[in-house]
């Protein structure tokens, strides 16, 4: 089984910087795309096989 991992900045390059097109592909809000545009290393989000996965932050019960 093969899988692909991308980030929103990678997808923006493929979509010629069109945030609306990336939001349509990921089935999310354009504001969500804008929120993760600066996360080039993928520390707060990743797109695995076309599904957006986000890091929601550290909760009170986690070791951070």
From Swiss-Prot:
InterPro entries: Phage_NinH. Pfam families: Phage_NinH. Belongs to the ninH family. This is Protein ninH. It comes from Escherichia phage 933W (Bacteriophage 933W).
């Amino acid at each position: 089984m093969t899988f692909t991992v991308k980030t929103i900045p990678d997808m923006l390059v493929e979509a010629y910087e069109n945030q609306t097109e990336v939001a349509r592909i990921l089935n999310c809000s354009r504001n969500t795309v804008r929120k993760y545009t600066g996360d080039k290393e993928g520390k707060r989000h990743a797109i695995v096989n076309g599904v957006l996965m986000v890091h929601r932050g550290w909760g009170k019960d986690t070791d951070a």
